[in-house]
């Protein structure tokens, strides 16, 4: 053994060839934390000191190569002064450079995934051989930063600036065949031939058949582009990427600027440019929020995994109620490998559900994400039925009938008599109390809520609602099934609206107050979209459905009359009474036309102004900042109440629920992180400025206490 550490070992393989193996003890994956970086330095020094070494193969002792940096260390590191961050990155790069500058050839053998620092380690090698099932990429822009271990320097010099910009700015994982096509790797082999492939390359380099020094040289030099080529490549890319990323996500464009600025430098000077830009991005609030989101997502996955121990395996599912929603649920279950019965009382609803599933599967085939054979397999896993004949062996039933408590209670009681005693019943409801629905059941311990968001195939969140009598097994089994469907489940306790809708309706309440104060809804939409929402509140209500919003508002007003009941008519009342129901019937706040692709396109319709006129009670002058605060303050305060009331267990789950469920701007991190970014004391003072708007704007006593004590939601 030439070197042995807790993360890295170096041992002789054969005739002067050594294997530098990453295998971080006590972890399921390899990552670049302080320990690993320090051991890499020591391992490289040990190789340099051993004259018998003729070549180095870099490998992993785990199912994946290296997943990247240890993100948990970013939180503390990024609080350091900018100069210290720059120094830290340059020190790390000295280690990578020392490996790259070894007097012997080097080959990286890539298995599983090599992301971020993992791929950057491979780029420092002379050759790369990749398993045909592996994926590689530089996903740092998703964290609000860009690659900091030489990725913006080595990758453009290896695969060309255009390809490198595409890889870095998109942050996507790339398949082996695509990596080979652009020259990011030198060979692709079957997983079982990975070491043999690496040995073949290293032996050919040692023998002189391959000139490893010539292969290494372009990575040490400036980019081979003249001034005109540089201008065309970089200016075009910056314009395109800025349009794609939008103004709130600076990292992709900053990555291009870094590549451009370093284009005329050799490796060492180029790395200084990279380090300076990396440190600048690391200090932004966007990076703080996106890293916080990543860590919150990891927390969600840990909590969901904790349910696995007691969860029952779902081998056969069923959905009650076909149509678009039932078809979406059936599709999601089947495409992820769980066969599902789809029952309805009407043949036409069954057909609608099957058409929906077939359409979604067909779309995946068209995009190359699914083979026709897999599509047929998924369709065969959806069994339509008008009866309960095959329900005896079902493990979980998702009830997705009309949003009416009496209908749901009747259907749930009926199906309970048709399934085995330990089958789980889950109601897909957005507002109806799980405790209320449970009253119709003989086995309420087997009953939970399972709230899917529309469209099911696109929305990542599922709220699993625990009722007063729901057993832990029922909750755990539903969480496990949601995960199996490829969703991100969050367990919440029962209350009107659960987490997401309970928080969303105060936001809509702020919007209603603005419209009643004479503020143009088109202006409100533009302001909130600029703030970062995927769509403004008027457009969102049209998409959700004015009738759905009207019903939800009434449910919330009944549940929380002290702050959500408004005696005055609102914009939603006026539109509902005028039968302007949104996209579903072509007119809501906006009117809708069909575009060339057959999708609804919103257009302004002046007739809506007459409909809204009776509910405008005053003409207030408000700034854009007022518009944001009228809507965001009640949303944030309701999120605080959900946490205080125990509806959601942690701040991380609350924030992720809003990001995944209603598209809360990710670069702002969620409602509670948004409060933290303002400062809890400052947020309380801000809310107090709008106290005259009603109880939705009144901070809780506990929040005032947090403000007084200088506390935060995330430390």
From Swiss-Prot:
The keyword Cell division does not apply. Disulfide bonds: none annotated. This is Fatty acid oxidation complex subunit alpha. In the N-terminal section; belongs to the enoyl-CoA hydratase/isomerase family. In the C-terminal section; belongs to the 3-hydroxyacyl-CoA dehydrogenase family. Keywords: Fatty acid metabolism, Isomerase, Lipid degradation, Lipid metabolism, Lyase, Multifunctional enzyme, NAD, Oxidoreductase. The record marks 120, 140 as: Important for catalytic activity. Residues 312-715 are annotated as: 3-hydroxyacyl-CoA dehydrogenase. Pfam families: 3HCDH, 3HCDH_N, ECH_1. It comes from Pseudomonas putida (strain GB-1). One of its GO terms (biological process) is fatty acid beta-oxidation. Pathway: Lipid metabolism; fatty acid beta-oxidation. PROSITE patterns: 3HCDH (PS00067), ENOYL_COA_HYDRATASE (PS00166).
